[in-house]
């Protein structure tokens, strides 16, 4: 049996989960940057 931590995940599983969380955060950030840019460009009250 693999060595489990308090979370019930192995080190490999937690590293894989961390990679997905970081990737999701980067994608969310990129979408947010594009959305804020478009809101600035197309919203006359922001100029």
UniProtKB/Swiss-Prot annotation:
Alphabetic keyword roster: Antenna complex, Bacteriochlorophyll, Cell inner membrane, Cell membrane, Chlorophyll, Chromophore, Light-harvesting polypeptide, Magnesium, Membrane, Metal-binding, Transmembrane, Transmembrane helix
A Pfam family in this protein?
LHC
Instruction: List where the protein spans the membrane.
Output: 20-42
Q: Kindly give the SUPFAM superfamilies that the UniProt entry links to this protein.
A: Light-harvesting complex subunits (SSF56918)
For the keyword Kinase, the answer is no
Give the Periplasmic membrane side ranges. 43-47
One GO CC term, this protein: plasma membrane
Q: Listed disulfide bonds for this chain?
A: none
* Keyword Protein transport part of the UniProt annotation: no
Membrane topology, as annotated, equals: Single-pass type II membrane protein
A biological-process GO annotation: photosynthesis, light reaction
List of residues binding a bacteriochlorophyll: 18, 36
* Cytoplasmic compartment spans: 2-19
Alphabetized GO MF terms: bacteriochlorophyll binding; electron transporter, transferring electrons within the cyclic electron transport pathway of photosynthesis activity; metal ion binding
Localization of this protein:
Cell inner membrane
Question: Do you know which InterPro entries this protein is assigned to?
Answer: Antenna_a/b, Antenna_beta_CS, Antenna_beta_dom_sf, LHB-1/5, Light-harvesting_complex
- Free-text function comment from the UniProt entry: Antenna complexes are light-harvesting systems, which transfer the excitation energy to the reaction centers.
The subunit structure is: The core complex is formed by different alpha and beta chains, binding bacteriochlorophyll molecules, and arranged most probably in tetrameric structures disposed around the reaction center. The non-pigmented gamma chains may constitute additional components.
Q: Name the family the entry cites.
A: Belongs to the antenna complex beta subunit family.
Instruction: Write down what this protein is called.
Output: Light-harvesting protein B-800-850 beta chain A
What is the native source organism of this protein?
Rhodopseudomonas palustris (strain ATCC BAA-98 / CGA009)
